[in-house]
Amino acid sequence: SSDVCSSDLVPAAKAAAMDAQLADTPCFIVLTASGQVLRSTSAPEPQAKRKKHDAIRNLVSSSTRSDVGFLTSDGVMHRVHSSDIPATEEYDVASSINVAEFLGIGKNIRVLGAFPLTEDTVIAMGTKQGVVKRLSADFQPKAAFDVISLKAGDELVGAALSTDDHELVFVTSDAQLLRFEAN
């Protein structure tokens, strides 16, 4: 009868271990201005002394069971499970990795930003040729998917989270300021 107990305990212990591994815990996904990415259990705090790669482009509040999207200049959103991004307990840029290498994208493609892929996420984006588009929670369940059709020679140059009451501002290469209502 002791064999029956041990055979019942082993699967239960394995199931508990799997639940612990997949616990949905809060985390932050950090994309630096220099193209490094990491997952941290704590938010970055201002440092008295600057470090290499410490300028933050995007900070996404997420959880280990959520997905994050990385939008690239070719108009593709790359879906990544937060738990797949290398983690550090305390925010430490030295533990980050190159986001382009992590995503496996080409050298001529730039990562423009990291975004939560939730039902209330709205992303405003603009292209080199002046196309402005808002993407409202139409996130396909694929690992990578197009979010905008680009004409030959065009590319995304900027993207940011947006709401209806935001104003979109673009600065052209000849220093003109272009303003659009987000809605």
Regions found by a protein language model. Name each.
Residues 1-183:
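Short, structured "edge-of-domain" segments at secondary-structure transitions
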